[in-house]
Amino acid sequence: MNDILIKLEQVLEQRKSAKVDESYISSLYNKGTDEILKKIAEESAEVIMAAKDGVNDKIIYEVADLWFHTLVLLRFKEIKVNQITNELSRRFGLSGLQEKAKRNN
């Protein structure tokens, strides 16, 4: 799974230098954080609607869109995929209550 995320990360990085009128991603970068966040909110709502519909293929499709636009945000903010996977690894094996208690200290 990590391989496709790394490949996407590389493409998203390349799109930073693409012409705005030739790249959807470049146009999002050009519009800034608020526009990227609007797309993430839109995709999140679509995941919720797909889940309520109960059709797994729709859920998969919409989650892929959500992950993609989240990756756009990460690249825009100069956050690498491995930083997220490292954080997930750090949390692995901790109960949710343990992880929350660590944040409150």
Curated annotation (Swiss-Prot):
GO terms for molecular function: ATP binding; phosphoribosyl-ATP diphosphatase activity. GO terms for cellular component: cytoplasm. CDD domains: NTP-PPase_HisIE_like. Keywords: Amino-acid biosynthesis, ATP-binding, Cytoplasm, Histidine biosynthesis, Hydrolase, Nucleotide-binding. GO terms for biological process: L-histidine biosynthetic process. It catalyses: 1-(5-phospho-beta-D-ribosyl)-ATP + H2O = 1-(5-phospho-beta-D-ribosyl)-5'-AMP + diphosphate + H(+). Pathway: Amino-acid biosynthesis; L-histidine biosynthesis; L-histidine from 5-phospho-alpha-D-ribose 1-diphosphate: step 2/9. It is found in: Cytoplasm. The keyword Nucleotide-binding applies. Its main location: cytoplasm. Its EC number is 3.6.1.31. InterPro entries: HisE, PRib-ATP_PPHydrolase-like. The keyword Amino-acid biosynthesis applies. Belongs to the PRA-PH family. NCBIfam families: histidine_hisI (TIGR03188), PRK00400.1-3 (NF001611). This is Phosphoribosyl-ATP pyrophosphatase. It comes from Ruthia magnifica subsp. Calyptogena magnifica. The gene is hisE.
